[in-house]
């Protein structure tokens, strides 16, 4: 689907009821079927006669017997690649492989392996109708979490990141039934199109209603009114359906630290949306009823590609987090999904953000230029521009990080007492940054994202773009701006007192 997409751009850089729905909002409290030791999500789906046809995770095996690679990273320093596998069959990712391989540099996730025998791997997405420029892979070090007591890495999607497979095997097409889930974060969201995982067009274009069937998670409201907060919706192409014909305020969403997002669609008459806290409890059914009555959704016309982090036409302005997800053949039962949720909870996903220190004054040095982030002419007025300059040891080049939420910070210039701001809340590539009075909005909130080797990317919350050294310039006075993530050192900053 396409909406609020980044404008197609080129840059030289060192690189989504006439029939009454049987819909309810209920909390499912049953525990589902009993699980044997070592029984993981795809084993559970298989026992329910709805086997996985795609299974993706950078954190753990999704079959009890799986002992292969989970994902592949590419090293920035020399372009070499390596696979990250599991510690043992049916186990968790061996993050030490990544840490060792990427030591002294940064890495990009370039492939997420399908754990089924169908080889529906995800690779970096090509351009499409909404944005003809190919996407970028995710920063491999950006999302460290704990699962099963082990350090592992999720997939951190910023604006411009996306993965795809247009030539899949066994994924539902036409009106065939399917189910799917993903585990994501309830605090890393925006209102741009489209943080999706699931079934999409095979040509990277919006080809019409019913051609997609993907889980969406975020705050974009396609059919007003919407409940506030991030919600699971069905991206069925040309609409993010919270339930029914689109607007479904009973789908109140979920903003827990980790979220289980569930969607199933029988292809002809019915779909269902569920969510759960991936750390505890059961699934809530947000909608279970008739497919939309608008033209094209009865029956569905799914095409069978798989996308992650983007819309079907490569709309790539969204942000989100991905830890694991599967797609099934057939329409899973509630009991099966309950058992899968219980297994996800057993993983014990957790996350701890300890850097930077709240209120400490830091200097931000661009890795490519060696220059520090600077308020032009030590300005203190609203609108003061931001550039890069040799370190002068003054407070015009010092910044305090003040925590305002889950890895969300305002960045205050020590001399001016004003915060780092995306000018006019811009969404376009190249949006300038300046100093402004604190307004409490997401245009002034930043995520501090590790990139390995003591380097960080700074992601503004409203657009998902990163703080960028304009054209990778090295001269004093070179401006800072916002751009999609490009996997280069011009967008990395060392942060030190």
Predicted regions and their residues:
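Extracellular glycan-recognition/adhesion modules and their associated mucin-like linkers
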Residues: 354-380, 395-428, 442-474, 489-497
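Acidic glycine-/aspartate-rich tracts in secreted/extracellular proteins
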Residues: 78, 116-118, 187-189, 266-268, ...
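Short, hydrophobic/proline-enriched secondary-structure or compact coil segments at domain edges
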Residues: 65-79, 153-155, 181-182, 306-309, ...
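Residues that flank catalytic or metal-binding motifs in active/ligand-binding sites
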Residues: 67, 108, 151, 176-178, ...
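Extracellular glycan-associated modules
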Residues: 30, 39-52, 107, 127-137, ...
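Secretory targeting and sorting signals
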Residues: 2-36
